[in-house]
From Swiss-Prot:
It is found in: Cytoplasm. Belongs to the RimP family. GO terms for biological process: ribosomal small subunit assembly; translation. SUPFAM superfamilies: YhbC-like, C-terminal domain, YhbC-like, N-terminal domain. This is Ribosome maturation factor RimP. One of its GO terms (cellular component) is cytosol. The keyword Transmembrane helix does not apply. The gene is rimP. NCBIfam families: PRK00092.3-1. Required for maturation of 30S ribosomal subunits. HAMAP family: RimP (MF_01077). It holds the Pfam family DUF150_C.
Length: 153
């Protein structure tokens, strides 16, 4: 099964559980590192930071449904974590939530002679984000290789 299809299937199973426990499903990833597969579930909540107890609670509940539904053929490790201080920004809603914050954006190829820009996120929609660094740059979302918050929350 293709990775994107696998993650969609896992999200359908996991998201209702995460939300039922009053968390936000921030991001899912399925990766192979050093010969081992990992399903990583990043959770967040509005009013407070994520604790180890929060991760354990979600891990137990998600583990139960994944064991029953068994959407992943390979053996894997399940990890539940917070997105962290320098969290990745993957979706339009992530970019919109952090307008006004400092970000680092890396490009696919180069854009106006640059491979990346660090600055304040000024605008975001599904087609472009605007970052004010050394200069103001309007970045097409398809040119974004990766983006994350910088600095302190």
């Amino acid at each position: 099964m293709r990775k994107d299809m696998l993650l969609e299937k896992v999200e359908v199973l996991v998201k209702p559980i995460v939300e039922e426990l009053s968390y936000e499903l921030y991001y899912l990833e399925y990766v192979k590192e050093n010969g081992e597969y990992y399903l990583r579930i990043y959770i967040d909540k509005e009013e407070d930071s994520i604790s180890l107890n929060d991760c354990e609670k979600v891990s137990r509940r998600v583990s139960e449904i994944l064991d029953v539904e068994d959407p992943i053929e390979d053996s894997y490790y399940l990890e539940v974590s917070s997105p962290g201080l320098n969290r990745g920004l993957y979706k339009e809603e992530h970019f919109k939530k952090f307008i006004g914050r400092e970000v680092l954006v890396r490009f696919n190829g180069s854009l106006e002679g640059m491979k990346k820009i660090q600055g304040i996120l000024k605008e975001a929609d599904n087609e472009f984000i605007t970052v004010q660094g050394e200069k103001k740059l309007k970045i097409p979302t398809e040119k974004i290789k990766g983006a994350n918050l910088e600095g302190e929350i």
